[in-house]
Amino acid sequence: HILDLTAGKTEAAKQISASAFIDACQLLGDAQSQLSGVAMHSATKSYLKKLNLIETERDSTDVEFDTYQGRRVTVDDGCPVGAGGVYTTYLFGNGAVAYGNGSPVGFVATETDRDKQTGAGIDYLINRKAFILHPRGIAYTGAKRDHVETPLRTELAMAENWKPVYESKQLRIVAIKHKIG
């Protein structure tokens, strides 16, 4: 699900706003209540804070956290900023991204090695781990893939390599492409 505000006719229509955020939630229809968090660039958060739209709450253990329209805010400058100052903000639901251990083809998780020529010898125990983050409800097909071992970031970014396997409303990730004032 993508709401691209940058196609707006005026500069104001291209900027993230409270009503645009509601429009993004509406892309999930009656399943929008599943959206529990929002990840945004720090510049986006600062812009929304200037508009007095970010609220700071305190939980029962006295820990403060920010919310936007009732959804917990995660700030990460790794959120994309494209040409012309186009930011991408993500809404997501609990469990929208799966985390697991991977075992790629040819992957050797544990092995030993020995350096016989150093002192009395040095033994090495080598452990490798492969971690996987994957959006739930979308299958990676690898339809356009040149790299043999693992897909490259450019290959992961290609829409042709992904196929939805869940009903559209069950995909609990929404991207908002926008500008800030």
Located regions from the model:
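Long, hydrophobic, well-ordered secondary-structure blocks that form the structural core
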Residues: 1-8
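Sequence/fold signature of self-assembling virion shell proteins
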Residues: 11-16, 23, 49-181
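Structured, hydrophobic secondary-structure cores that serve as assembly/anchoring elements
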Residues: 1, 18-52
